[in-house]
Amino acid sequence: MIYNIALSLVEGIGHKTAKLLLNKFESAEAIFKSSVKDLSSIEGVGQMRSKAFKDKQVLKQAEEILVQHDKQGIDILFYKNPSFPKRLVQCEDAPIILYYKGVAPLNAQKMLAIIGTRKNTEYGAKMTEYMMEQFQVINDLVIVSGLALGIDGLAHKFALKNNIPTIGVVAHGLDTIYPSNHKKLAQEMLAKGGLLSEYPLTSKIELANFPMRNRIVAGLCDASIVVESDSKGGAMITSKLAVGYNREVFAFPGRSIDSRSAGCNELIKKNIAQLIESGDDVLTYMNWTPAQTNNKPKQALLFTQLNEQEQLLLKLIQEKEIIHADELKLKSALSDSKLASYLLQLEMQNIIKSLPGKLYCMR
């Protein structure tokens, strides 16, 4: 493993060139033991870079990294090993080394990236929460995000709340938690999910690393879901990377006057993302079948105890999944006061829940 780590540390050798070398020489050890002449013949290496492989300090640093991570219980994953995320192997610019600590499988049957703005609205928070409640019926699902403020943190939080393993991809060593107010969340994730990075311990926080981190988020997953995003930012970068990797992209639409939905609307308008209104839309599109649950018999028993008007409202909400109060009023022919009263009763009984913008859905 020392030579594998060392290959990722050689100055001037990027991920693509490292893979070219591995394909040519078959192992990292063989690369370091090759002559400067042989190394120079590889495209992207040249004589100056090939000399860097003869720097003994690189191997010493790699050995120190191996010892440090072993002490911390952090797994070091090499590009050629079976434990490396198989979806990421398909991405040309994927790193050759990853550092991982946690219990969630990196090769789960289903993996979704939940991404969005650091400055989410209540609507974005509600949709993230609602989506996770719908995802809890899916077996072998892992949620991936970037542990940032806003939608990222909410995705991790609500995944844990619904007992869904969640992995945070960070842009620095695993000895650092950024932002610092996510330290408690990160500890919970280590117990029920995991933290992943391409950077070894003690690596500094550098702004340039955050956009690079996004390619791992996109590459790890079958699909990326943009909850809220302005027209620029990390979520837009991640979604376009996902398309480049031939992965699905989904986005929640928002009002045209909401800047934090401008990115989502743009992705939908340009046919980069599929429009979704709920997590169920994602499950349907991906053809992921929910596991059997015991919720329906319990709900059916509750529904028989409701009056005729309440049962009608429930039927309307079930048919649409998410429905506006104005549509409920139109189809039920109830007055504003009666409708508000019935909806409140149903919400107090924990059968339905209200969403921002006078929207309602089933719990």
Where do the protein language model's features map onto the residues?
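Short, positively charged patches
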Residues: M1-N139
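Glycine-biased, small-residue-rich flexible motifs in mid-sequence functional cores and linkers
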Residues: M1, F78-R363
